[in-house]
Amino acid sequence: MFIDTAKILVKSGNGGNGCISFRREKYVAMGGPNGGDGGNGGSVILVADRNLTTLLDFTYRRKYVADNGEDGGNSKCFGKKGEDLYIKVPIGTVVKDVETGKTMVDLAKEGDSYIVARGGKGGKGNYHFATPTRQAPNFAEPGMPGEERMINLEIKLLADVGLIGFPNVGKSTLLSMVSKAKPKIANYHFTTLKPNLGVVKIEGANAFVMADIPGIIEGASEGVGLGLDFLRHIERTRLLVHVVDISGVEGRNPIEDFKKINEELKNYSVKLWDRPQIVVANKIDMLYDEEVFETFKKEVNKLGFDKVFKISAATRDGVDDLIKEVTRQLSMIPITEMEIPEEERFMPEEKRFTYTIRVEDGVYVVEGSFVDRLLKSVNVNDPDSLRYFHKVLRNKGILDELKEMGIQDEDTVRLNDFEFDFLL
């Protein structure tokens, strides 16, 4: 089972409402408004963490919601900000917006972070709305709703080095010899059904991560078997180590195997085919005809590969020299972020003031989260508050949309339980 993609719902917190309150102190006449601002809602933030290698955790939890901001208080007390929700993901996680299908971010390095849902802004308290002619505003600003979206997570970077080759050529054995990884090893095809990772440490050099990529078969680039899943796992490795079974004990032809694997790489992605590649002839401990290796080496040289490493992963013969070469080449290959064409990048849209208008039995019904929160912060029995309410409806385009829909003088408009007659 491949746990390299996951779809989750993220929702940031709503902003707290501004407070409506007035100073009430002895000997202080007409103390004035002192309602505090609401706190901002918490955001949902993804963070790349080197300690994670799969998206397995997201199969058990699909919804992530940050805290709401608290409402403002009297005496100009600000509401508490909602706690941000941090979600750890593996390095190399690519995040896409489900609705648009566009890439939001590529978390390519340790500690990279991205806000996938920004918390709603807290509303202003009534003290902000005091003017020389409106000294006691009996209204406040509502907090704004948070963002909610479905996102796709996809791992496109599992390791610095990818071990590639047909099934059962010794990739898992090699990984177990050079790291502390303990992959399942057996003598049958598709032993490895998901990438096994191992950290390879060599004295005097930086450690690197090596992945035993599941065996590729013919037609992998066209989706045969688990081919596309396999190829996706090596798309972001910096260096490929191509392992072939030089012994031929299973009746395989190492030259044909080598060509077929490279053909699948090329069909899937030319960039992947151009990736630096170290050729490894494994199982020399079972090789009974040295001429087989020499013939293989000559054919590989013709294809543009100057050197072939001759090893036995089982006995560790030649493995140390191979790892030194891998380390040397990695030191010259920069870690690059995946290029995202500008037109494919996700651009968040402003959806804070969403509402709908419908006509029901001659009544214009305005609905939406913004309308709900606005009504909670308006005193419909106060003239100043109603004037502010009218101003908000005008500024947000609701009144203009009602006119475009053909509303007439004295037609009824309903917002939740509040109704009023429209005047042109």
From Swiss-Prot:
Query: Which residues of the sequence carry a binding annotation for GTP?
Result: 165-172, 190-194, 212-215, 282-285, 312-314
Which residue range or ranges hold the OCT domain? 345-424
- The EC number(s) given in the record are 3.6.5.-
Among InterPro entries, the record links this protein to:
G_OBG (IPR031167), GTP-bd (IPR006073), GTP-bd_Obg/CgtA (IPR014100), GTP-bd_prot_GTP1/OBG_C_sf (IPR036346), GTP1-OBG_CS (IPR006074), GTP1_OBG_dom (IPR006169), GTP1_OBG_dom_sf (IPR036726), OBG_GTPase (IPR045086)
- Write out the annotated subcellular location: Cytoplasm
Domain OBG-type G per the UniProt entry, residue ranges: 159-331
Q: Which residues form the signal peptide?
A: none
Name the needed cofactors.
Mg(2+)
Gene Ontology CC terms, in alphabetical order: cytoplasm
GO BP terms, alphabetized: ribosome biogenesis
Out of the domains of life, which is the source? Answer: Bacteria
**GO molecular function of the protein, one example?**
GTP binding
SUPFAM superfamilies cross-referenced by the UniProt entry: Obg GTP-binding protein C-terminal domain, Obg GTP-binding protein N-terminal domain, P-loop containing nucleoside triphosphate hydrolases
What does the UniProt record say this protein does?
Answer: An essential GTPase which binds GTP, GDP and possibly (p)ppGpp with moderate affinity, with high nucleotide exchange rates and a fairly low GTP hydrolysis rate. Plays a role in control of the cell cycle, stress response, ribosome biogenesis and in those bacteria that undergo differentiation, in morphogenesis control.
The UniProt entry, under PANTHER family, shows: DEVELOPMENTALLY REGULATED GTP-BINDING PROTEIN-RELATED (PTHR11702), MITOCHONDRIAL RIBOSOME-ASSOCIATED GTPASE 2 (PTHR11702:SF31)
Q: What is this protein called?
A: GTPase Obg
